[in-house]
Amino acid sequence: MSQGQAIFGRPITSVMSGGLYVVVNAITLHKGKVILFDKPGVRPGGQDLGNLWFPWDFLSYGEAPEAACKRVLKQWGKCEPKTMNLVEVFSVVPPGESWHLAFQYIVELKAPAKKGANIKDIKDIEQRQLPRMVGWLRRSDIKRYLTLAGAD
């Protein structure tokens, strides 16, 4: 067995340096507008407009990414997907950090989102108004994902 293979032990409930984070991100749209969620708390550096995020969360042990995406939409925006397109499985190991594996979805919502748990506000903007960063996602990546999904 090679030293660098991705073989892990049983799941744990705490963050562990050098481990693996499997997450789902839902880039949310409704009637052509981008839906952003103001969620105070976790704030990465470089955001222009405050605590703006797309719904995201870690996958639970054994949870399918599609099910996680639907769960996250209900938690953040009390909403359901009209359409859901997986546009990328993003894998990166930032220097000195853990492995990040993210399932990136473009989601068209059935109805407008409502504030879920710990959501301060919901903003709908035109795609051309995208800030430089939304959560950990750069504007250029968001635009690329929208293009891949045919939602640009």
Residue spans of the language-model regions?
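Acidic, metal-coordinating catalytic segment for phosphate/diphosphate chemistry
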Residues: 1-25
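Active-site-adjacent beta-strand/loop module that shapes the phosphate/pyrophosphate-binding cleft
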Residues: 30, 82, 90-114, 144
